[in-house]
Amino acid sequence: VHLTDAEKAAVSGLWSKVNVDEIGGEALGRLLVVYPWTQRFFDSFGDLSSPSAVMSNPKVKAHGKKVLNSFSEGLKHLDNLKGTFSSLSELHCDKLHVDPENFKLLGNVIVVVLAHHLGKDFTPAAQAAFQKVVAGVATALAHKYH
């Protein structure tokens, strides 16, 4: 991902304010509520029958935390996202058969959750920078698909 120095500063500065555990669960939960067809990849997570069930589901929260920790790792390697996410791309492609479009959906949900949590600090310029980052991560995760 090509970010200007100002964009990199905005991303790292705002990310330092983020509670990854909280935001991860909320982002994955919102993905499953807003795009219910994505639930098919999470059959083992138990009750996903309603928005409140999804948002309070401990397995959703735990996996969301894991997802956002990986995203956080990617922020440290913006110049090599494909390398950083290579094994996750392979897992999601070959073993889990996740539609790569879902990575874009999750990226957009992450941006919504960041806006919600960061409020006025999440300026249009900051959003533009994060949109570049989530698009880059989605592309990297889709890299192993044929």
From Swiss-Prot:
The keyword Heme applies. The keyword Ribonucleoprotein does not apply. GO terms for cellular component: blood microparticle; haptoglobin-hemoglobin complex; hemoglobin complex. Pfam families: Globin. Signal peptide: none annotated. Heme b binds at residues 63, 92. The modification N-acetylvaline is found at residue 1. The modification N6-acetyllysine is found at residues 59, 82, 144. The modification Phosphoserine is found at residue 44. Residues 2-146 form the Globin domain. Red blood cells. One of its GO terms (molecular function) is oxygen carrier activity. The modification S-nitrosocysteine is found at residue 93. Keywords: Acetylation, Heme, Iron, Metal-binding, Oxygen transport, Phosphoprotein, S-nitrosylation, Transport. SUPFAM superfamilies: Globin-like. It comes from the Eukaryota. GO terms for biological process: hydrogen peroxide catabolic process. Belongs to the globin family. Involved in oxygen transport from the lung to the various peripheral tissues. Heterotetramer of two alpha chains and two beta chains. This is Hemoglobin subunit beta. It comes from Spalax ehrenbergi (Middle East blind mole rat). The lineage of its organism: Eukaryota, Metazoa, Chordata, Craniata, Vertebrata.
